[in-house]
Amino acid sequence: MDEKDVATQPQETGQNPRLSGQDEDPGRPEGAEAPPSEGALAPHARRSEAVGPKPPAPGGKLLSLKGDRAFQRLRKGRAGRGRYVSVKWLPAAELRVGIVVSKKVGKAVVRNKVKRRLREILRRLHLPQAHLLVVASPEAREADFAELFRDVVRALRKSGLVQ
């Protein structure tokens, strides 16, 4: 087949050469394109933009106590004790928290669980600005969230940080 034999101009039949008349959708306007692909994400969007920002934690992110000096200063702070935790605090310009869970509490998985619970409890409480140290006792591993919550509040009340 030679190039001379191939038609370069569409045939003038008045129909779209891609679809025959019987296969055409009569309700679709001529020249309409396919709808954009459906789904949660647009092709150019990143997941974080499409889903939206992650909601903030109930009380916001807690700032950690940093350095040995901060922990040493807390030795002179006001103290309170509960069944599962003991707390010490000093007034400060911002709220900073140190959580101590010793190996006596259990293996790493158990210690991390206790720390996560204590961090969440402290986030939920609206604490005044202070440097706060929370030390978990070995019995804290048996406490559920509600018991630990009540005990932290009890210790904070005894220390005078909250009413």
UniProtKB/Swiss-Prot annotation:
One of the record's GO cellular component terms: ribonuclease P complex
Top-rank taxon, per record: Bacteria
Biased composition (Polar residues): 8-19
Listed GO MF terms: 3'-tRNA processing endoribonuclease activity; ribonuclease P activity; tRNA binding
EC number: 3.1.26.5
Pfam families assigned: Ribonuclease_P (PF00825)
Region (Disordered): 1-68
Reaction it catalyzes: Endonucleolytic cleavage of RNA, removing 5'-extranucleotides from tRNA precursor
Keywords in alphabetical order: Endonuclease, Hydrolase, Nuclease, RNA-binding, tRNA processing
GO BP: any one term: tRNA 5'-leader removal
InterPro entries: Ribosomal_Su5_D2-typ_SF (IPR020568), Ribsml_uS5_D2-typ_fold_subgr (IPR014721), RNase_P (IPR000100), RNase_P_CS (IPR020539)
Broad EC category: hydrolase
Family: Belongs to the RnpA family.
PANTHER family, sorted: RIBONUCLEASE P PROTEIN COMPONENT
Assembly notes: Consists of a catalytic RNA component (M1 or rnpB) and a protein subunit.
Miscellaneous: The open reading frame (ORF) for this protein entirely encompasses the ORF for the 50S ribosomal protein L34 (rpmH). The two start codons are separated by four nucleotides.
Function: RNaseP catalyzes the removal of the 5'-leader sequence from pre-tRNA to produce the mature 5'-terminus. It can also cleave other RNA substrates such as 4.5S RNA. The protein component plays an auxiliary but essential role in vivo by binding to the 5'-leader sequence and broadening the substrate specificity of the ribozyme.
Protein name: Ribonuclease P protein component
Native source organism of the sequence: Thermus thermophilus (strain ATCC 27634 / DSM 579 / HB8)
Protein encoded by which gene: rnpA
